[in-house]
Amino acid sequence: FELLHCHSAYPMPLEEANLNMIPILKKKFRCKVGYSGHESSASNVCIPAVMLGATSIERHITLNRTWYGDDQAASLEPDGLKRLVRDIRLIEKILGDGKKRVWRSEIPAQKKLRQILT
């Protein structure tokens, strides 16, 4: 079971995204919460949604955003979808797992800068 936080306008005005609802819905309903995006600039809203805990992103796709239709302007073309997935995967790596550790890449600096105080 997963709820989707959504705005019904096509395209959605960015200032109406109210992404802070994601953690609120997660806490209130004790379930996964995703984001259903209808904005014309996907990464401006989908990336912060992931950072706030969205566990899925729902987007409309089209082969051409200039085609006639209510949701074409708010849809992603294939290249836009590829970029969005790439960026979300990078953000997931950047956010990490929340466990503090010393990374292998830190060891040389640690050896160089660490001093023993007596």
Where are these regions (language model features)?
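Catalytic cores and adjacent flexible loops of soluble metabolic enzymes
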Residues: 1-118
